[in-house]
Amino acid sequence: CHEFNLTPHFFNSEYSRSSIQGGYQLAKELFRKPLDCTAVFAATDSNALGILTAADEMGIDIPGHLSLIGFDNISATALSRIDLTTVDQPKRVMAVQAVDMLRDKIENGTQGYVHQILLPTLIQRGTCRKLDPSK
């Protein structure tokens, strides 16, 4: 955002639950006014799929007029008609580490919290366009 002199805005709505329908309703609310943003980063891929549907119905070209990124990398996002750019969490690593921590707690009576930082991966597909920093 800094490189392009953009300020992120957070959009909360009564429709912000993590579902396709929630994303659809949220987008219908967001798209009622003229777009003053270049991209939407949805909380989940399900929300992004709903946003994609609403944008299509309202004639908003993704990625031509609006870039869209989801979060989760669910399998449907790779379908050619969807082709959603998303963020993939290291789910398998998360599961293995959670089981290891639970086993350690059961076997050794370990107390407290463990702070882990796991790096996500950006999966670049077809719903984002490159911005020109000179504009």
How should these model regions be labeled?
Residues C1-K135:
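Bacterial carbohydrate/catabolite-sensing allosteric modules
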